[in-house]
């Protein structure tokens, strides 16, 4: 903006006042330093600002304060006079980390007001931090280069299309884990969320829907890729972090897939145009350790509205990652079609999209299943899940377990152990059979 414009001058005055404590005399001194001379109107402005904003000084920004300056009668008279205020030097406000919002009362977040503080917290140099966060400098057309911070795996979906798993390389992954465990894990998601939260799982997600007349299941399309960098940045800013720190944290936790990778032979014909556009824009990468927690936080308004919808209908709502579940009595069953329309509309308004082909209305007379858990009378292991896991375990006993790792899990043994433990929890008798097969697997064949 022009340095003689009203906006420039009011912002400079606002920054000067914010560059120190909210004491009227001190603010007058700072305004005098910026404008080169003292003026009578400064005293009234400073007293009014101190009284109005002093109690929440750390949360006031330049934009808010500049509007007050522009509306001050003393300043307006001076601006319209023959010798209007003129900025002779700029006094920037030191970076300030604002207190967390009221809904995070009692949550202690790391104090990272500057990029230097962020770099020190992550134990990297500032220029390294810039490199890991500003990946836009890598040519977007190339499929992959040593400069990329991600490697890519193409996983086939059941419908014949594919999903791209974006796996951060070791150094970036280490930084993301620090952000996850040192910052994001401290911020609670909505209470209806059961995915990627300590002490919660698919069983706690499904259990509230046991014994209901109807269970309605929804699936969100491209859950992680739908969360673009702008939404991540807004969440980080809402936590109180200054502009530059929020931008850098956003850069560390988001990615855009190079165009060359999207048109590679293994992906070109299995990703539609809309999906390709999502991947090209900076988004939460499926495969980064920070993505699940950030996705939950970015979906907070979605959960808030859907939980409110459920309450208004006398129903129950839970979410596990991209799986949404509603359940209730006969009244909900009769209005299921209207609920589908309303849920889809709310999802769109909040930046997500329901996949209508995966929506299921499950009545009491048929099998009601959520995330592999049957909920008709009590949480139970679905027969299809039991058979599929038994087949994988049996094949692992008969041949190299690595050959069964079709989804490329980094620790396939731990993955299978988790699935078996889940089965034991849901159905001890069936789970014991799976555990017996798992114990027969020989893991020294390269897996």
What does each model-identified segment do?
Residues 121-132, 136, 182, 187, ...:
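N-terminal low-complexity, intrinsically disordered segments
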Residues 105-106, 146-156:
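Nucleic-acid processing machinery
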Residues 1-139:
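Non-catalytic, polymerase-adjacent accessory regions of viral genome-replication enzymes
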């Amino acid at each position: 903006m022009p340095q003689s414009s009203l906006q420039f001058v009011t912002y400079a005055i606002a920054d000067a006042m914010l560059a120190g404590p909210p004491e009227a005399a001190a603010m007058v001194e700072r305004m005098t330093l910026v404008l080169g001379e003292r003026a009578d109107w400064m005293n009234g402005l400073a007293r009014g600002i101190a009284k109005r904003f002093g109690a929440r000084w750390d949360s006031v920004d330049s934009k808010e304060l500049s509007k007050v300056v522009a509306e001050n009668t003393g300043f307006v008279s001076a601006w319209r006079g023959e010798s209007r205020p003129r900025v002779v030097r700029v006094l920037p406000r030191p970076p300030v980390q604002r207190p967390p919002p009221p809904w995070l009362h009692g949550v202690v977040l790391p104090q990272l007001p500057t990029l230097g503080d962020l770099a020190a917290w992550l134990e990297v140099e500032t220029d390294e931090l810039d490199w890991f966060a500003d990946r836009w400098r890598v040519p977007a057309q190339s499929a992959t280069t040593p400069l990329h911070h991600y490697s890519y795996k193409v996983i086939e979906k059941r419908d014949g299309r594919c999903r791209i798993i974006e796996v951060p390389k070791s150094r970036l992954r280490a930084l993301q884990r620090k952000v996850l465990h040192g910052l994001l894990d401290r911020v609670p998601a909505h209470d209806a969320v059961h995915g990627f939260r300590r002490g919660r799982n698919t069983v706690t997600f499904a259990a509230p829907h046991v014994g209901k007349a109807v269970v309605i299941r929804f699936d969100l399309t491209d859950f992680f890729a739908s969360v673009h960098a702008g939404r991540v940045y807004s969440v980080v800013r809402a936590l109180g972090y200054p502009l530059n720190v929020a931008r850098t944290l956003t850069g560390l936790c988001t990615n855009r897939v190079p165009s060359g990778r999207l048109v590679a032979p293994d992906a070109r014909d299995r990703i539609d145009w809309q999906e390709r556009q999502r991947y090209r824009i900076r988004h939460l990468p499926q495969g980064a350790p920070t993505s699940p927690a950030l996705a939950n936080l970015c979906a907070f308004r979605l959960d808030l509205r859907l939980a409110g919808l459920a309450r208004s209908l006398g129903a129950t709502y839970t979410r596990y990652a991209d799986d949404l579940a509603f359940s209730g009595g006969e009244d909900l069953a009769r209005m299921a079609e209207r609920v589908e329309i309303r849920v889809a509309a709310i999802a769109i308004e909040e930046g997500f999209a329901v996949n209508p082909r995966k929506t299921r209305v499950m009545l009491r007379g048929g099998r009601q299943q959520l995330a592999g858990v049957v909920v008709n009378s009590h949480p139970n292991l679905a027969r299809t899940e039991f058979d599929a896991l038994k087949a994988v375990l049996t094949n692992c006993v008969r041949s190299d377990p690595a050959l069964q790792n079709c989804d490329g899990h980094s620790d396939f043994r731990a993955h299978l152990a988790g699935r078996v433990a889940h089965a034991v929890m849901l159905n001890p008798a069936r789970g014991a059979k799976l555990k017996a097969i798992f114990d027969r697997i020989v893991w020294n064949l390269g897996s």
